[in-house]
Design a protein with these regions (language model features):
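Large intracellular
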Residues: 2-128, 204-227
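Helix-termination/interfacial motifs at the ends of transmembrane alpha-helices
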Residues: 2-9, 121-194
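Transmembrane helix-loop junctions in multipass membrane proteins, especially transporters and channels
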Residues: 40-44, 158, 191, 195, ...
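Transmembrane alpha-helix interface motif
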Residues: 172-227
């Protein structure tokens, strides 16, 4: 009896190397980086890269600084506001406000100083966030450019079947890389930085009223001494 061999289709496994194409990577990453540099100031680009180190930090909390302000207030009650001039304050906003209070600035001006510094800090954060938002916008466009270049190369080499596959790979993978860079890297980074910046601005505004209150202590202390 004749045995008829039934051929089974070969199962092709997904090989990770098939999804790597140096030319497509260069077009997407290089084009995105160039677009970001051309659209933003170099200082903002540097801040955007430096902001990557803050992604996994906890959101800023003003509780520790409020405790320091309370301690400084007790010192000012006991020894006078001018004794705070020797205090070592690590936080720049708090240090600037205490220095202004020691110099005799009014409470309203101290509060305005804190709010202005919070606004300036938020503006710097916004510039860094816009760098990553711009990268998320540029990456898919660079992927489309890579796709067009790959298709042009493919149609130009129709007479050479050996090069058609490589050109088609560039065309398809460039689109894939652009989508991945935008949706798995740039946009998540921008969203995370935006949440951190919003939380920090809200927390730092809590410092304005206590720091402004420090500016009133010297007058109150003088009245107590006179009485």
């Amino acid at each position: 009896m004749n045995m008829v061999a039934i051929s089974q289709p070969a199962v092709t496994a997904l090989v990770p190397g098939t999804f790597l194409d140096p030319l497509a990577i260069g077009i997407v990453l290089g084009g995105t980086a160039l677009a970001v540099v051309l659209r933003n100031r170099l200082g903002d680009v540097g801040r955007a890269l430096a902001a990557l180190t803050t992604l996994w930090r906890r959101p800023f909390s003003a509780d520790a600084l409020l405790g320091q302000i309370a301690a400084q207030e007790r010192i000012a009650h006991r020894h006078g506001l001018f004794s705070l001039d020797r205090a070592v304050i690590a936080d720049p906003d708090m240090a600037a406000a205490i220095e202004a209070a020691v110099d005799g600035v009014s409470p309203e001006q101290v509060e305005r100083l804190v709010c202005d510094r919070v606004t300036a800090r938020a503006e710097r954060h916004r510039a860094a966030i816009e760098v990553w938002t711009g990268a998320a916008e540029a990456a898919p466009a660079m992927g489309l450019i890579g796709t067009i270049l790959g298709l042009v190369q493919m149609f130009a080499s129709m007479q050479d079947p050996a090069t058609i596959g490589a050109a088609m790979a560039v065309a398809l993978l460039a689109t894939l890389y652009g989508a991945l860079v935008a949706n798995l890297v740039a946009m998540p980074v921008a969203s995370r930085l935006k949440r951190l910046a919003r939380a920090e601005a809200s927390e730092r505004l809590r410092l304005a009223a206590p720091l402004a209150h420090l500016a009133t202590l010297e007058r109150a202390r003088k009245r107590e001494i006179a009485a």
